[in-house]
């Protein structure tokens, strides 16, 4: 069983994922890897800690609650249905994505979080015993659109603030807000972990990587950017723990050297202790959309814990 370690580095408030076709953005420096997902977690983490020194302690408390809820079996019972509010910010006609494209993303979330994705059965035998049907559903609640003169929004949450030209979140303690805009810097999307301000809570996805139709662009055109980011919103870490042979705070995922890109050939062995086969098809890795198609049971438990009584997202589980 993988040792689970809790550290300040692993407790990131915000995770920002990128398609590193460019080497930098106005907000975060990234390393160029053409057509690869990438992450500027370190820079964003430092910025959030500078702005909110109390954040680390708050997230450690959420982690303690999560561990206790899992250990004591205090997970939410029954199905959880999450209303999704989509906020579209557009400068061009292409950025003003269609309702069809938006609904295609909701459909992907429902399939991926319920083990109904067509590639779910591709999970290798070695991991078939831990692949999870999370049992969380998503319903499109509303779509708000706003024309803008901005060519890109960056990663400082401007798209979430009407005073900065964005759209304020709608009922963020009971509805998942999803902003769709051009982020810039090659960034695909980012999410706020449980514990952050409700004024900025939710997920941001670049319009070119949302859903499966319209402007969705390969190799990130199967809606898995949102699946990955909603995983972060539900308290999941990257599977490699954001450091070499790190911990994602989940016991049934193997220890990864680092992020995986593209669609790795199976089996792909880690050089970490024990040389485990890496779970490259996990939604919390960095493979192409076609290369990721499972959550683990341990990840399911982490997600369900935050919706339990006393959990940081319990308000979403109320009737």
What are these model-predicted stretches?
Residues 1-4:
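Positively charged n-region of N-terminal signal peptides that target proteins for export
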Residues 6-9:
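Sec-dependent N-terminal signal peptides
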Residues 13-16:
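C-terminal motif of bacterial Sec signal peptides marking the signal peptidase cleavage site
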Residues 18-21:
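Bacterial signal peptide processing site
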Residues 23-26, 205, 256-319:
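Metalloprotease/metallohydrolase-associated module, dominated by Zn2+-dependent proteases
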Residues 25-172, 308:
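Propeptide-to-catalytic entry region of secreted or membrane-anchored zinc metalloproteases
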Residues 98-105, 222-226, 299-302, 312:
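Stable alpha-helical elements in mature extracytoplasmic
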Residues 107-267:
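Metzincin-family zinc-dependent endopeptidase catalytic domain
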């Amino acid at each position: 069983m993988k040792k689970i370690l809790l550290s300040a580095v692993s407790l990131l408030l915000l995770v920002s994922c990128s398609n590193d076709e460019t080497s930098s953005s106005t907000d975060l420096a990234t390393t160029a890897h053409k057509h690869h997902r990438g992450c500027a977690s370190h820079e964003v983490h430092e910025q959030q800690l500078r702005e909110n020194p109390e954040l680390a302690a708050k997230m450690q408390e959420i982690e303690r609650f999560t561990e206790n809820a899992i250990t004591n079996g205090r997970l939410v019972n029954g199905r959880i249905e999450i209303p999704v509010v989509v906020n579209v910010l557009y400068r061009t006609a292409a950025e003003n994505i269609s309702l069809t494209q938006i609904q295609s993303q909701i459909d992907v979330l429902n399939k991926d979080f319920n083990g109904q994705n067509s590639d779910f059965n591709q999970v290798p035998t070695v991991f078939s015993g831990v692949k999870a049907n999370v049992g969380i559903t998503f319903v499109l609640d509303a779509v708000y659109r706003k024309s803008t003169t901005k060519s890109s929004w960056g990663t400082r949450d401007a798209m979430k603030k009407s005073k900065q030209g964005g759209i304020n979140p709608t009922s963020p303690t009971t509805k998942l807000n999803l902003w769709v805009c051009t982020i810039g810097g090659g960034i695909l999307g980012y999410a706020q972990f449980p514990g952050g301000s409700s004024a900025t809570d939710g997920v941001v996805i670049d319009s070119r990587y949302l859903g499966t139709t319209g402007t969705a662009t390969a190799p990130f055109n199967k809606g898995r950017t949102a699946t990955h980011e909603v995983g972060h919103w539900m308290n999941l870490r990257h599977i490699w723990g954001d450091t070499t042979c790190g911990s994602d705070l989940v016991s049934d995922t193997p220890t990864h050297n680092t992020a995986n890109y593209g669609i790795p050939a199976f089996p792909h062995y880690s050089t970490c202790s024990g040389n485990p086969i890496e779970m490259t098809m996990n939604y919390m890795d960095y493979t192409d959309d076609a290369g990721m198609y499972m959550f683990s049971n341990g990840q399911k438990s982490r997600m369900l814990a935050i919706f339990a009584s006393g959990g940081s997202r319990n308000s979403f589980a109320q009737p």
